[in-house]
């Protein structure tokens, strides 16, 4: 089952947020997916990060992001050690690795082709870019999940 959360407020500020019903529904669907590539569209502010950090892991997970804040933001939501591949940060066999796309494209040889069972792409509308395709084609994960609020922002190109 998934981790459960209690929403805690202090001085009108949300300190911890729980999974919403629609996030749980997305997680239930992902649990039953066959191997392949899938796109999850959730509107801005609906908690894509909270959702993808709660996906059940069956092997190592790679999360790709194009900006520093998107690399560091998910760390607090994972219930396991998280490695970072960005600038002067390097991972060390953690169950989850969050990587800057620009950094990882120059470090692919550090990893085996079958290193990651699942790749999650944050802001997946960027995934048609050559740098993303280089990473995806290098690893060929069992499950490739893209999360975005705006799937049609880029031209209609596949990210696989």
Name each model-derived stretch.
Residues 80-90:
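Conserved RecA-like helicase motor-core motifs
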Residues 126-160:
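Post-DEXD/H (motif II) to motif III coupling segment of the RecA-like Helicase ATP-binding lobe
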Residues 60, 94-96, 117-118, 141-145:
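Loop/turn-to-beta-strand initiation segments
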Residues 9-39:
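Conserved pre-motif I regulatory segment
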Residues 122-123:
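Walker B catalytic acidic pair
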């Amino acid at each position: 089952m998934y981790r459960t959360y209690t929403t805690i407020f202090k001085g009108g500020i949300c300190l911890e947020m729980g999974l919403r019903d629609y996030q749980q529904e997305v997680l239930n669907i992902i649990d039953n997916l066959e191997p392949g590539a899938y796109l999850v569209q959730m509107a801005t502010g609906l908690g894509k990060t909270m959702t993808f950090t709660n996906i059940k892991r069956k092997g190592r997970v790679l999360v790709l992001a194009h900006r520093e804040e998107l690399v560091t933001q998910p760390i607090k939501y994972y219930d396991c050690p998280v490695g970072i591949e960005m600038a002067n940060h390097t991972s060390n066999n953690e169950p989850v690795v969050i990587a800057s796309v620009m950094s990882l494209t120059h470090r692919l040889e550090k990893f085996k082709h079958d290193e990651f069972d699942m790749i999650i792409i944050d802001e997946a509308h960027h995934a048609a870019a050559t740098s993303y395709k280089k990473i995806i084609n290098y690893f060929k994960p069992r499950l490739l999940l893209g999360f975005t609020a705006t799937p049609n922002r880029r031209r209609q190109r596949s990210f696989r």
